[in-house]
């Protein structure tokens, strides 16, 4: 009786192991990458958003504000029982209109009660715009629930439902 062993050369086995390891690395990387691209929004991101939005509005920089609002953003604004919905373009035009008529302009935003859900977050917001025109001070105060979405390395306003109060002094 003869027993025959079929041994593969050790180099061939090493190549097979390496190719399987390499395939495993490629698969693991491709599964991990989307998770990294859709990073979770943090409190720091929300704080940075508020700081950036206030700075952009106070600088009257439409391009900087535009970079903080998603292209498909919708902002629903209610006042005295009437509601209107603004898209990004309408919102930016409204800001520019307020800036153009103001001899003095100020913007403040406070975000709190933030709820995080992966690459989205919702927050209560109070924004105050102070517009001085012809020595008359107008305060536009909005109380909102804002939805933020992560996009690339940025956090953007995606949706907002707002109640507006206008005070003239």
Predicted features by range, described:
Residues 1-17:
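N-terminal secretory signal peptides that target proteins for export/translocation
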Residues 72-74, 125-131, 163-164:
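Generic short beta-strand segments
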Residues 139-169:
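Short beta-strand edge/turn micro-motifs at domain boundaries
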Residues 54-55, 69-82:
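Short, solvent-exposed secondary-structure junction/capping segments
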Residues 34-67:
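Short, low-complexity N-terminal intrinsically disordered segments enriched in polar/charged residues
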Residues 53, 65-66, 73, 91, ...:
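Hydrophobic pocket/interface hotspot
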Residues 92-134:
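Surface-exposed, charged secondary-structure patches
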Residues 22-33:
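Bacterial N-terminal signal peptides
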């Amino acid at each position: 009786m003869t027993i025959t062993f079929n041994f593969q050369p050790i180099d061939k086995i090493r190549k097979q192991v390496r190719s399987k390891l390499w395939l495993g690395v490629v698969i693991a990387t491709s599964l991990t990458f989307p998770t990294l691209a859709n990073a979770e929004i943090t409190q720091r991101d929300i704080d940075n958003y508020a700081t950036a939005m206030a700075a952009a509005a106070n600088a009257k920089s439409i391009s900087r504000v535009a970079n903080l609002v998603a292209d498909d953003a919708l902002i629903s604004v209610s006042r005295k029982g009437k509601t209107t919905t603004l898209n990004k373009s309408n919102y930016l035009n409204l800001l520019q209109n307020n800036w153009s008529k103001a001899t003095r302009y100020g913007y403040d935003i406070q975000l709190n009660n933030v709820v995080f859900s992966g690459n989205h977050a919702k927050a209560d917001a109070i924004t105050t715009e102070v517009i001085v025109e012809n020595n008359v001070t107008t305060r536009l105060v909005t109380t909102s629930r804002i939805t933020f979405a992560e996009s690339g390395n940025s956090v953007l306003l995606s949706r907002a439902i707002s109640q507006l109060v206008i005070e003239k002094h």
